[in-house]
């Protein structure tokens, strides 16, 4: 009876952790979606086709092995106090990407055997616009990263966009 109670308790606590992790991810997504398309008033960067504020690429779901991909682009400014007056501000763009790949997490089944879970892990990348190459890149400074796992064990990630009138797009 102890084993049954212990297994039930573990399942309940695991579900609570998953639920909290999901809420944390949604909060993070909301903060970044609010930044989409932001530009400073004096921003002098030329617009580019890669600077789409929000871009959603539809996935095929768990059966197809892919989930939706979300790209968010927003403006920022780098300040250099040692630069000459009038050249201290350099405007830039950041691209945040959320994407999925098959999870590699292994779970232990009630009979003691192990199997890889049937789900995705969510990866996040943060890239900065490189004016010299006209592409988003990592490695330009230590705040950038590529495909860092933010959440494991997700059944699917689906984004449903709406227009200004509340009608579903796509």
Ranges and model annotations:
Residues 1-40:
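Aliphatic-rich helix starts adjacent to a transmembrane/signal segment
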